[in-house]
């Protein structure tokens, strides 16, 4: 978890700490969390914010990795001791991406995937959050997208963006339903049909040509299937115009009626 400072407090000073438990059953005699263990930090003038941590227990060798950071600077990677939860002695952080935040790591079929949230947040329907991905044969990188652009240079293949009257998807999470079946979580900065409130998104996690794709949540209705080989694309140039909305903060109680936002 992250503590104080960083993007949470308006500065660049932050910490990532871990607490470990042998069981999640509160009735077990082994149920007891360790004291907080600091595994990463950032100073006021550092080009990284030590928040937004993500963990990967490598299925190939049992090593434990933690990524962290925000769009204020670099995304960094450190190795932890899976037996103690502490930072591996002498471990030096590695820069693996830039211009994103809230990263997470996945291993699949010989590839390590780094998913990060790109764009701006915290402005309701005007937020531009989207989730991108790069991959590497090594957990330490370099991570590149489908066009060969390095994530250390701002690259990233799109996984999910705004759509269906929801905007600003960010903070990827993985949930394995069964062998070969997985779902992804994110939060949308604004749902236009809920007055611009932030909502949880759950999508099927699909794979296409070796890349993760956010599936659609299909509803009853009539659908049109378009051929990839002969489909058409429409390119638009759009001027940004702010959308007026009432700000709803997730940490405050809000009993106001839910009113859909008007189309822009």
Regions found by a protein language model. Give the residues of each.
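Lectin-like carbohydrate-binding module/patch detector with strong preference for beta-trefoil
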Residues: 221-264
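Beta-propeller and closely related beta-sheet repeat lectin domains
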Residues: 51-54, 101-104, 170-173
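Glycine-rich, flexible loop segments associated with nucleotide phosphate handling
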Residues: 31-33, 128-130, 167-168, 254, ...
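Beta-rich carbohydrate-recognition and catalytic domains
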Residues: 1-51, 57-98, 107-112, 117-160, ...
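Short, solvent-exposed secondary-structure boundary motifs
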Residues: 42-46, 93-96, 163-164, 225-227, ...
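Active site of divalent-metal-dependent phosphoester/diester hydrolases
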Residues: 152-174
